[in-house]
């Protein structure tokens, strides 16, 4: 009997180990080689597959080298931010494949193909190759199919233009407080002062999203912002280990800290959401902030079609991260570029004077700022917050004249596209807001070559929010100060999920 039990145990163990070996072999060798063969038969050029790691090691090595030294203000930023994709583009042409571990990733530069990917949201879905990213922000941005449709329907009312216009006073309050602090610094230094604007802008946009999303101040939401910033750094570090199967489950110090930070964020958000729900049940009038509008929209859904408390919390996480991060990045590069291009700074200031005079900025006036809009679009073109988007294919698909197998990813290289000379002309790398003077369609020649907020059905729901907030901030800043780059400024854009200034952004502010 003992022999029989032992034999069965050994047999089961052999089967389990054999199954695991077979699955591993299939994942790290057989399937990648099959997909590589398929893509090459389509005429696609790309890198040869390296078992398990793919191109990650080469990519990280080039990125580390690029980040090790700053660049000149007039240099192209793409070799510093996306060195490996740029090299592959030069080597293999405008459609090529590389490897994210064992997953082939096809980079496309054709606007018609990009348009097709954006439009077919049920066929080209969000890639989930790095689950740790969901710790910092999941929600609407990470969903597909019917779940995405449901969440988009519920969240949409919170971002209607009329609702966003009602948030302009909150924009004004948060921006005025920071401008007031800068004014004190400059006054103390007798009309001119060096200020690293980066941490101030981080604080300002955090305060804006705290007020407009949750009706609170930055101090109340400060812990969430601190935890999300810490998570962003930890996730970037963990990304280098992403190729190791099951790495996120290893009890490393970094993994334990990520999970602890994520738990703390959920605990804080659960308290915020539950407090609102209790107030609603007690008969209090709903708040007119993003969370209040979201809860009202959710309660208005038929039974079974609303969001759970957990799902509401995920959307709140996304509000906090995307609502703060995107506008901070847009504002810092706007001020850096206007410091370089004093003529455009003067034009923007003159427009602000013409539209508002001495009046307090309002939504109607902000929407009349044509020069400001041109400047912001050009900044978004040259320094997009997110440098690429990725989509996944789960079944054989036709994309233009390509037939692509299930199991591959599509990379939409925002930065490379928006600085591409074939699409934007020989001056693609230059700061020329005039290219947008007749609107987006004319500037892009009706092609999908400008998509800092994505494009099509999945275009960023907070686009108008970010642009209106940026216009308010720049209006108040331009009224109060002129500014130029400090001699201590070091030009070193790099990515920490979004495009940050690696060594801050010290400017010289002059009081007007």
From Swiss-Prot:
Gene: CYP72A13
Expression induction: By cis-jasmone.
Residues the record lists as binding heme: 460
Protein name: Cytochrome P450 72A13
Coiled coil: none
Cited CDD domains: CYP72 (cd20642)
Keywords assigned by UniProt, alphabetized: Heme, Iron, Membrane, Metal-binding, Monooxygenase, Oxidoreductase, Transmembrane, Transmembrane helix
Pfam families: p450 (PF00067)
UniProt topology in membrane: Single-pass membrane protein
Chief localization: membrane
Cofactor(s) it depends on: heme
Membrane-spanning ranges: 2-22
Localization per record: Membrane
EC class: oxidoreductase
UniProt-listed InterPro entries: Cyt_P450 (IPR001128), Cyt_P450_E_grp-I (IPR002401), Cyt_P450_sf (IPR036396), Cytochrome_P450_Monooxygen (IPR050665)
GO molecular function: heme binding; iron ion binding; monooxygenase activity; oxidoreductase activity, acting on paired donors, with incorporation or reduction of molecular oxygen
GO cellular component, as recorded: membrane
